[in-house]
C-alpha cells in the first residue's frame, strides 16, 4: 500500500510518466500557517538536474494544493497536493516489460500486478514518487518546528568516502540551518570534492554508486513513543523503507552496538541542570522504543541506482530465454544527495505521528 | 502500542513480574492443525536458563490456550495463549524507579507513563515479553510451512566472533531443519566454542555483549509485498524493532550495498528451467518491496544486554542528583542465542500478513 | 478522518469551493478494465441540477484520473481522481462564521478546527464531497460486478410518501438494471408524482424534507464478513454514516425486528436445489456479521437538508448573542434522490473490502 | 475481526464453552485508578440468571486481570482480563452443526470457517462474548467519568411496550446514577410490570421478544469527532453492531428525521449564559460527525433471541435435506435488559477513542 500513518495519514499516488503524482495528508492540525517557499525549497533539494550526480532530466515539481489550505493555513481538512507530470509516457522504456532491469522492481512488479502495472519510467515504483513524500514531510517539519523539533540529515557516505558523523550529544542549531538548505549536505564540507569525484568516475564508467544518509531529530521531548510495536525505531523504519533503494537502517550505535560490551554501549545518565541527559548517545535517543530527550539518530543504507549504462544479463520474459540488456537514457549515477531531504521528510511524517500519539501535537 | 498487523493481528500483553503474559492472535485462517509440541519447542529455544549464555532464572513457559483452538485445530476465532508468571513481583528491583538503569527503558518508561508503569523486572519492557511473540510466530510458521515457506535464523555474530553467512541463493532444507531445533544456532558450528568463550569472559567481567542474527525466509513466492509502505522490508522491520535490543536491520547486502557500484550490486536474472532466478542475491529477495522468489534475507543488530554487574553512573530521580548504580540479580550476558527464535517468529508473523495481503494465505 | 478501509482504502479530499475535490483509492486489484462511461453515469446521477428536487447550481463533475489507470485498466497503483471546482470561493456565505446555520456543521466544525476550517459552501463538510465517494464506489461496483455482485438502491420514502420495499428474497436483475440508471430511483414508479409534489411544496415553503434510501446487495456469496467488529453491519454502517445527513441505518427487519417475536423474526432455512436459502429475509442477508447468501438489505435515514430559506434563530459567535439567520442561495429541498447513488457507492466500497478480507477479490 | 479501535484498541477473545474469554485493552492512559467493584457491578448487570427475563444458566463472571494494573492503577501497558469458563463444552448442542438454528450464526459461521469453528454454545458468536466488552467499557467509563463524561442507557422498548425517552436536552445526573446500577433500567419504572409480562408470555409460549435500547452520553465537550469517516455516528455504530442481535441504530431523531421538514428537524442555537446550546436535540448531539456539546443520543434495535423452544424448519447440512429443529436448553426470552450495560460499554470504548483523537484523553 502507498498509505502510511495513524493519527496523521499520508496517501501517495502517481506513476512516473502518468498525468500527475501527489499526496493526500489526512489528520493535520488546523490553524498551522505553512511557509510555501520553505516547502518548495525542500522539494527543489530533491529535484533532479542540479549537478552531475543527478539526472539531467528536468522536472518542474511545483505542487498545486487542491485542498486543506486557506491563506496558506491548514484548515484541518485533508491537504491534497498534486504535481503534474510534464514528462509523460514515451517509448524510452519500451523493452522493460520483456527484459526486466536487474536491481529494479520491473520483474517483481510484473508478477505482483500480473503485467498490468505502468512500466514507463518505473511507474509507481519510480524514485519520482519521493517528491510527494518530501511535500508531506515538509509540511510536517514546519508543524514540528513550532514545537522546537528539528530534523536534519547529511550524506554520511558515498561508496567508501565518508563524511564525519553527527556528534550525537550535541547537534548545533547552525549546523541544522546549513544542512536544511544544502543540495549536497555534508557536515565536513571538505568531503564534497572526493565524493563528487567518486560519483563522476562511476558516471564515466556507465556505473552508479550507493551510500548512506545520517539523520538527526533534535528537540524531541523525552517520553514520546511506545514499547514494542509503536516504538520510534519501528515507526521510523516502516516509513523509511518506503523510500526506493533503502536496504538498511540503524539507530544510535546500530550495527556497531552488536560488537560492543554493555559497559561500552550503555549511556550513563547525568543531570545537566534540571535535565536528565546521557554523556554518550549510543542509544540514538531511544530506549525501549521511547525518546530519552537526547537527539534521535539513525542511518539509512541506499543501494546504488540500479539503472546503469553497462550491458547486463537478464531474461526475456516474452521469449522465455536469457537475454542481454543495455539501459539507455539519463540516470542519476548516485541518488544519495537527493535522498537527504527525502529521508528527513519521511522522518518528519513519522515523528508527527509519534507526537500525536502522546497528545503532543 | 503492543498490537501489530492488519490481516492477522497480534496483541501482546503482560508485565515481567505480573500475573501472566500472553498474546491474542486475531485473523488466523480456520482449520489449520497445530503441532503444539512444535510450538513448545520453539518457546523452549527462547526460554532462559539453558546454559551459561543465559540467565539461570527459571521460567516455565508453558502457554495455556484459552480460545481459538479445538482439537488443536484453529477455529478461526481469536487464539489467546497465556503464560502464567511464577516469578512474580519481588523486592529485587526496588531501586530502579529512583535510579534508572543505563541502556534500559527505566527512564523513558518513567516519563512516558508518569511513573505508573510496573518496573519489576522491566515490566512490559522486559525481554520476557518476547515469549508471546514466539508463541504467535510459531503458530504462523506452521501455517506458512503448509505453503512451503520456511524461516530459519542463526547467530551471525557475537561481539567480533562471526558465523559464516547464509549462501543467499541456496539455503538447503537440511540446514533449516537443523537450525530450527538448535538452541545455539550456527551455520558453522565450529564458531560455537569461540562465541561461548567471548560470552563467558563478559560474564566473568560482570559485563555483557551484543551480536547479530541473520534470518532467511525460503519458499516465498515471487509477487508478495507492495511498493512503498507495505514493502517487505518495511513490514518486517516494523515488527522486528518491537524486539527489545534490536537497533538495526538490513536486507540482502544491506549496509554493504551502500559501498557498492551498481554493476556489483545488481543481481542478474536468468532462467533456471522455467523459473526466473538471480545468480546473486544482494537484493535479499526483495525488489521494490516485493518478493522476487529468491530467499528473503535480513540481519538484525542486537545491542548488549544493558543489565550488567559493573557499577555505573546514573541519576537519582527522587533526590534529583547524580548517583551510582550496581545491578544485582542474574542476567543474560548475551541474549543473542535466545533472540534467534524470537526473530524467526517476528518474521513469521510479518510474512503471514504479507501473504494474506495478496490472498495467498 | 476522511480515509476509510483496510484492504482497499479510500482517502477523500477537497472543500466545496476550493480548487478541487477527489479521492485516492489504494489497494485496487490490477488488471480490471473500467467502463469510464459507466462511472460518469453514476456521477451524473448524483450531480445536482437535474430537476426541481435538486439545487440548480451547476457542477461539471468530470473527474480527471491522475494515476492508477492505463488504457482504462487498473495498474494496481493508487488511483487518484480529481474533480476541479469551477464554482470557487465567493462571498455568498460570508455570515456563516459569525452565525452558524442550524442543523449544519458550521458550529461544530468551528469548534473542532478552531475557526480555521474553510466555511465557503460548507467546506469539507459539504455534500459535494460525496462526488468522490461516488467515483470510488463506481469503480468498486464494476469490480464487484465481475464476481456477480450487484448493488441497487431506491428512494424508500420522502417525508411520509413511501415507495414499496424490495422483496428481500427476490430482487430481479431487471429491477437492478433499471434502478442503476435512474435519477429518481423507485421500485413503484407511481410514487414519483406524489414524492415530487411533497418536495415541491417544501420548496415553495422555503423548507426541505428528509427521507430514506433502501439498498440491496445481491450475489454476495455466503461466508463473507466476520463476527464482532468486522461484521457486515458494522463495516457498512461505518462508511454510510460518512455521508452527510445520514442519521440512522437498519439491516433486514431492523427496528421492526425489535417489535417481533423470535418465531416471527427467525428466517427458516430450506434447500433450493443445492443452495441453502431462507424463506423470509428479516436477517437482511447477515447472521453473526456474516453473509448468508441471501440479499444484503439495509435502509438509511436522511434528515432534511438543513439549508432552508425560512428565517431561523441561531447565535452570533462574534457578538456573543442570540441572532436571526436567513439563508439565501439555492439549495436542494430534498437530497434523497441524489443520495441514492451515494449510498450504493458507499456500500460498494464496503463490500469490496469485505470480499478482500476473505480472499474473494 | 474481534479487534476494534485506533488510539485505544480492544481485542476480544474466547468461545462460549472454551477455557476462557477475555479482552486485551491496549493504549490506556497510565495512572488511572480503577474502581474494581464498579467494574464488577457493571459485569453483574450483564450477567444472566437474575430474573425470569434471563437464562437461569449460572455464570461466575469474575474477571482476573493478568496485566496492566498495579494497585488497581493502570500502568499504561496492555490490560488483559480473563474470565474463566466454568460451563465448558458439553453435548447440549450436538445437533447444531448438522442443523443450523434459524436466526443464529450457525450456518454463516459454518461457511465462513469451513466447519472448523467451535459451535458449542455459539462459540465465538455467543452473547457471552459481550462480557469482555462490558469489562473494557467499564474501564473506559471510569476514565471518561474523570473528564465529566457519563454514559447511561435504558430499555426503550420491549416488543410493543415502551419506556419514555430521554429528554434529549436535559438528562439529570440523578437519573444517570439510578440507571447505571439498575438491572432493569427504565426511565419510567412503571413500564417494568408490562414489559415483564410481555417477556413472561413469550417465555411461556417457548418464544422470545426483541426491543430497543436508548443510550445517552453527557458531558462530551463540543468539537469531538471528525467529518466523514471518523464521525461520532460512524465510530459508535461500528462497535455497536459488534454486539450480537443489534440490527439497527439511529442518532438523535434518527428515522423520524426522515419524515421531518428542515424547519422541524433543525435545532436552533441559543446562548445559555456563555454556552452555545440548542433548544431541541434532533441532531442527537452530533453535527457533521462532531459533537455539539449537547447530549449524544442513540437508539439500537435488538432482534429477538433466535433461540426459541418452538419447533422450526431448517436444513440438515449433513443429509443435504430440509429438517425440523427443536432447541432445548435454557435461553433468555429477552436479552434487552442485559444488553443495556453492553451498549453503554460499547459507547464508552467508542467515546474514549474519539476523545483520544482530539487529544482530550
Language-model region placement:
Chain A
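Glycine-rich, N-terminal phosphate-binding loop and its surrounding beta-alpha-beta segment
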Residues: 42-108
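A short glycine/serine-rich beta->alpha loop
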Residues: 9-14, 117-129, 222-226, 281-287, ...
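Short acidic, glycine/tyrosine-flanked loop/strand segments centered on an H-E-D-like triad
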Residues: 97-123, 315-331
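Glycine-rich anion/phosphate-binding loop at the beta-strand->alpha-helix junction
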Residues: 13-19, 206-322
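Internal helix-turn-beta structural module
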Residues: 9, 307-361
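N-terminal, positively charged regions that mediate nucleic acid binding
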Residues: 1-57
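Alpha-helical support elements that line or immediately flank enzyme active sites
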Residues: 19-31, 127-149, 230-238, 294-305, ...
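Glycine-rich, mobile lid/loop segments that gate access to catalytic sites or pores
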Residues: 112-228
Amino acid at each position: 500500500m502507498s498509505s502510511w500513518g495513524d493519527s496523521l495519514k499520508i496517501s501517495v499516488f502517481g506513476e512516473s510518466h502518468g498525468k500527475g503524482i501527489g499526496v493526500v495528508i489526512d489528520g493535520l492540525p488546523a490553524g498551522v500557517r505553512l511557509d510555501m517557499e520553505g516547502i518548495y525549497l525542500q522539494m527543489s533539494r530533491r529535484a533532479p538536474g542540479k549537478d552531475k550526480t543527478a539526472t539531467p532530466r528536468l522536472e518542474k515539481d511545483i505542487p498545486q494544493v487542491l485542498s486543506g489550505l486557506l491563506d496558506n493555513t491548514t484548515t484541518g481538512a485533508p491537504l491534497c497536493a498534486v504535481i503534474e507530470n510534464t514528462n509523460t509516457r514515451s517509448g524510452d522504456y519500451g523493452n522493460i516489460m520483456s527484459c526486466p532491469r536487474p536491481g529494479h522492481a520491473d520483474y517483481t512488479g510484473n508478477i505482483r500486478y500480473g503485467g498490468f502495472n505502468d512500466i514507463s519510467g518505473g511507474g509507481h515504483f519510480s524514485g519520482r514518487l519521493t517528491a510527494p513524500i518530501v511535500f508531506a514531510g515538509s509540511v510536517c517539519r514546519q508543524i514540528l518546528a513550532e514545537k522546537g523539533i528539528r530534523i536534519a540529515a547529511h550524506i554520511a557516505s558515498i561508496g567508501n568516502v565518508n563524511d564525519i558523523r553527527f556528534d550525537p550529544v550535541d547537534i548545533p542549531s547552525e549546523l541544522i540551518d546549513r544542512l536544511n538548505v544544502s543540495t549536497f549536505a555534508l557536515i565536513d564540507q571538505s568531503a564534497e570534492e572526493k565524493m563528487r569525484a567518486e560519483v563522476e568516475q562511476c558516471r564515466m564508467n556507465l556505473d552508479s554508486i550507493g551510500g548512506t544518509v545520517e539523520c538527526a531529530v533534535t528537540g524531541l521531548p523525552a517520553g514520546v513513543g511506545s514499547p514494542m510495536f509503536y516504538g520510534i525505531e519501528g515507526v521510523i523504519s516502516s516509513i523509511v523503507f518506503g523510500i526506493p533503494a533503502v536496504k538498511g537502517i540503524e539507530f544510535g550505535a546500530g550495527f556497531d552496538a552488536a560488537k560492543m560490551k554493555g559497559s561500552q554501549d550503555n549511556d550513563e545518565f547525568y543531570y545537566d541542570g534540571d535535565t536528565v541527559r546521557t554523556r554518550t548517545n549510543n542509544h540514538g535517543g531511544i530506549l525501549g522504543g521511547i525518546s530519552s530527550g537526547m537527539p534521535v539518530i539513525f542511518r539509512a543504507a541506499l543501494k546504488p541506482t540500479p539503472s546503469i549504462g553497462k550491458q547486463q544479463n537478464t531474461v526475456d520474459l516474452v521469449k522465455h530465454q536469457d537475454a542481454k540488456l543495455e539501459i539507455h537514457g539519463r540516470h542519476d549515477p548516485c541518488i544519495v544527495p537527493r535522498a537527504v531531504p527525502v529521508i528527513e521528510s519521511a522522518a518528519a511524517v513519522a515523528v508527527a505521528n509519534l507526537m500525536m500519539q502522546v497528545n503532543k501535537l
